From Swiss-Prot:
Pfam families: GATase_5. The active site is at 98 (nucleophile), 225, 227, 235. This is Phosphoribosylformylglycinamidine synthase subunit PurQ. It comes from Methanococcus maripaludis (strain C7 / ATCC BAA-1331). Part of the FGAM synthase complex composed of 1 PurL, 1 PurQ and 2 PurS subunits. One of its GO terms (cellular component) is cytoplasm.
Length: 272
């Protein structure tokens, strides 16, 4: 059987700054990528319908003015939302990381069984300590319905945000939990819950939530950056792990497999 190579539309423009490493990671996972400025979509030079995956990368779109991800989301709502809903209804995939998660949250893309796309169900607010957090954390997959996380358990991954505290009301939380839409939660290195304790939970997120998906499992957003931790050499403990592996006659793999697996799963979705 001929392997399908999905095309990824990597959004760009106005303060987004992770498009290059995000495109690189998707390429390593087996996809083709185009980095596309939002104005080119609005002008009709590129079309969402020509792609299988839309990627909202990290960064600080519009300098986080009016709230992180809000201005960029409004630009999409005012110009491209019909195209985006058509893309969703066609059964394709959308992924958002950090600022991308914030944009998608403001767009209302994480629909519940009781809601429709365009209805906002949650927020990503200022970190509890009112500080920008830039370091590595552990997150655990929660046996969700998400297509991006097949075969993933615990991930060691960097964060870089000042507004990452997930919040929703209790009714929404219970529906997310019931429908297995809570994808990632903050934890310790063994997978034990952070229980909202700092520094395991870096931002005070409600129920330690680091990432969620929509009711179909095809749309996911998360605050941590797996695309920034593609290679083993990027890990803080790399030199120690390298020395231990050397003494044991082993070689450290090039990639952090759990992190690239998110992107491989997206590619494999179109080869089922």
């Amino acid at each position: 059987m001929i392997k399908v190579v999905p095309k990824v539309l990597v959004m760009s423009g106005y303060g987004i700054n992770c498009e290059t490493e995000t495109a690189h990671t998707f390429q390593k996972a087996g996809a083709k990528t185009d980095i596309v400025h939002i104005n080119d979509l609005i002008a009709g030079k590129k079309k969402m319908a020509d792609y299988e995956i839309i990627m909202f990368p990290g960064g600080f779109s519009y300098g986080d003015d009016t709230g992180s991800g809000n201005a960029f989301a409004n630009k999409i709502k005012n110009n491209l939302f019909d195209d985006l809903k058509e893309f969703i209804n066609s059964g394709k995939l959308i992924l958002g990381i950090c600022n991308g998660f914030q944009v998608m949250t403001n767009l209302g893309l994480f629909a519940l069984p009781s809601t429709d796309y365009g209805e906002r169900i949650s927020a990503l607010e200022a970190n509890t300590n009112n500080r920008y957090e830039c370091r590595w954390v552990h997150i655990k997959e929660n046996e969700s319905i998400c297509v991006f996380t097949k075969g993933i358990d615990i991930i060691h991954v960097p964060i870089a945000h000042g507004e990452g505290r997930f919040y929703c009301d209790e009714k929404t939380y219970l529906e997310l939990k019931e429908n297995k839409q809570i994808v990632f939660t903050y934890c310790d290195s063994e997978g034990n819950p952070a229980n909202k304790e700092y520094p395991l939970n870096p931002n005070g997120a409600y129920y330690d939530i680091a990432g969620i998906c929509d009711k179909s499992g095809r749309i996911m957003g998360l605050m941590p950056h797996p695309e920034r931790s593609l290679y083993s050499i990027s890990e803080p403990e790399y030199q120690l792990k390298k020395e231990i592996a050397k003494r044991n006659g082993e070689i450290i793999p090039e990639f952090i497999e759990s992190n690239i697996q998110i992107f491989k799963n997206a590619v494999e979705y179109f080869n089922k």
